[in-house]
């Protein structure tokens, strides 16, 4: 089962979305100033789940494709996938799977 955790690093907080195989699947595009705000952001992401929009982009550092989950109306990025993929189709498929799993993930 996929799950969110909240971690603290360098004075900020972020949620991480963990896949069932134990790797980090996604994180927020920007950190948060408090544990509470990071926790609420993870809860809102899980609540939005299947309504989120999946988009792909080319990572400027690696040149590989990645996915992100965007707000369904504003298209604001809410989550960015960790993995890099050779093709946009691979990234899209992984993002679709993550979107589905996000809706069922618990927040620790």
Predicted region positions:
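Charged, amphipathic alpha-helical segments
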Residues: 1, 45-55
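Intrinsic N-terminal pre-sequences and regulatory tails
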Residues: 1-5, 107-108
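Short aromatic-glycine-(Arg/Gly/Cys) micro-motifs in beta-strand/loop hairpins
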Residues: 3-26, 58-78
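Tandem-repeat architecture and repeat-register "anchor" residues
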Residues: 16, 27-28, 48, 81, ...
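A short, exposed loop/beta-hairpin motif centered on an aromatic-Gly-Thr core
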Residues: 23-35, 76-89
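A short, charged, amphipathic alpha-helix used as a generic interaction element across diverse proteins
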Residues: 33-49, 86-103
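Intrinsic, low-complexity N-terminal interaction/targeting segments
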Residues: 37-43, 54-56, 65
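Mixed-charge, Lys/Arg-enriched low-complexity segments
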Residues: 50, 57-62, 66-74, 92-108
């Amino acid at each position: 089962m996929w799950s969110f955790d909240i971690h603290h690093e360098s004075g900020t907080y972020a949620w991480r979305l963990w896949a069932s195989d134990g790797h980090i699947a996604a994180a927020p595009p920007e950190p948060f100033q408090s544990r509470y705000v990071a926790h609420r952001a993870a809860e809102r992401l899980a609540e939005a789940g299947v309504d989120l929009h999946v988009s792909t982009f080319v990572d400027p550092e690696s040149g590989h494709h990645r996915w992100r989950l965007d707000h369904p109306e504003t298209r604001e990025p809410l989550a960015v996938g960790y993995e890099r993929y050779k093709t946009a189709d691979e990234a899209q498929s992984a993002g679709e799977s993550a979107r589905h799993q996000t809706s069922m993930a618990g927040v620790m």
